[in-house]
């Protein structure tokens, strides 16, 4: 069976999409290639790294990347995680499905916001896996 590809996209590839990539690799397992990117690059937020470390997922080696058109075109599913990414997502080929899963941006907010958004992303990916 060929691996499917899921591509998580948000504005800066700093918090939400980084956490989604970490959870995606953990939850979806070997059957999926999991990537993340941003409309811009803001660097991986240290609090996102810490939030994921708290649940034993290491994203410290992740980099903040711009959308890669090759990955985009080969994706089975592109998931936008904020309205900016949803509105500015490049045109997708007809074979690529797109979904919007909106999450609040925890950047610049209290630690508890990082934990809440992290946990909401986990639940969304768990629900997706059950489809």
Swiss-Prot record:
pH influence on activity: Optimum pH is 8.
Annotated phenotype, changing residue 91 to S: In strain: SW4, SW24 and SW1
Outcome of mutating residue 13 to A: Loss of K(+) stabilization over Na(+)
Catalytic activity annotation: arsenate + [thioredoxin]-dithiol + H(+) = arsenite + [thioredoxin]-disulfide + H2O
Effect of residue 127 to N: In strain: SW18, SW4, SW24 and SW1
Enzyme Commission (EC) number: 1.20.4.4
Any one GO molecular-function label of the UniProt entry: protein tyrosine phosphatase activity
Principal place of residence: cytoplasm
Residues forming the catalytic site: 10 (nucleophile), 82 (nucleophile), 89 (nucleophile)
Keyword entries, A-Z: Arsenical resistance, Cytoplasm, Disulfide bond, Metal-binding, Oxidoreductase, Plasmid, Potassium, Redox-active center
Result when mutating residue 10 to S: Loss of activity
Cysteines paired by S-S bonds: 10-82, 82-89
Modes of activity regulation: Potassium binding stabilizes the enzyme and increases its specific activity. Activity is also stimulated by sulfate. Inhibited by arsenite (mixed inhibitor).
Enzyme class, UniProt record, top EC level: oxidoreductase
Effect of mutating residue 89 to A: Loss of activity
Compartment list: Cytoplasm
One BP term from GO: response to arsenic-containing substance
GO cellular component, one term: cytoplasm
KO phenotype (gene knockout): Deletion of the gene leads to a complete loss of arsenate resistance, but does not affect arsenite or antimony resistance.
Binding sites annotated in the UniProt record for K(+): 13, 36, 63, 65
Post-translational modification: Cys-89 performs a nucleophilic attack on a Cys-10-Cys-82 intermediate, forming another disulfide intermediate with Cys-82.
Subunit organization: Monomer.
Role of this protein: Catalyzes the reduction of arsenate [As(V)] to arsenite [As(III)]. In vitro, also has low phosphatase activity with para-nitrophenyl phosphate (pNPP) as substrate.
Name this polypeptide is given: Arsenate reductase
Lineage of the organism: Bacteria, Bacillati, Bacillota, Bacilli, Bacillales
Gene name for this UniProt entry: arsC
